[in-house]
Amino acid sequence: MPNSSSSKVPSIKAQHRIAKKRAVRRRRIDLDCGCSIYIHINCAKDGNGFTHMGRHHCASGREFRFYLGGSKSPLFQDVQXGGSTLHAHKDIPHTNPVQPQPEESTKSSQSVPELPSLDGIDSSFWDDIFE
């Protein structure tokens, strides 16, 4: 009599275990500023780009990273000179990519100024709480 368990679909736990072992297929794009962007292969098929530091980059860059087998050793294939395809958009205002930071203040860092300063509370108050 044939074994009926051979026709069963693997359990969901087994399917998840197999999916976790599968390598994520992604493409690496090295930018001129030194940053590296990884784009999932399925996302890159749409041809959408992205903006980084005020510059628009095409998602169809020429440098790919493939992971081979279990060793995960990188193999680079550069079809053209490296880097990403850059498009200058005249419609997008290109301001300084460095955002100004708020100046540091010497005032209290409490967000609600009506609350009393914690430094002014007597130490016996804290002793009663933590006993």
From Swiss-Prot:
Entry's Gene Ontology molecular function annotations: DNA binding; structural molecule activity; zinc ion binding
Zinc finger (unnamed): 33-52
Main localisation: host cell
Keyword Zinc: yes
Subcellular location: Host nucleus; Host cytoplasm
UniProt keyword terms in alphabetical order: Activator, DNA-binding, Host cytoplasm, Host nucleus, Host-virus interaction, Inhibition of host innate immune response by virus, Metal-binding, Phosphoprotein, Suppressor of RNA silencing, Viral immunoevasion, Zinc, Zinc-finger
Stated name of the protein: Transcriptional activator protein
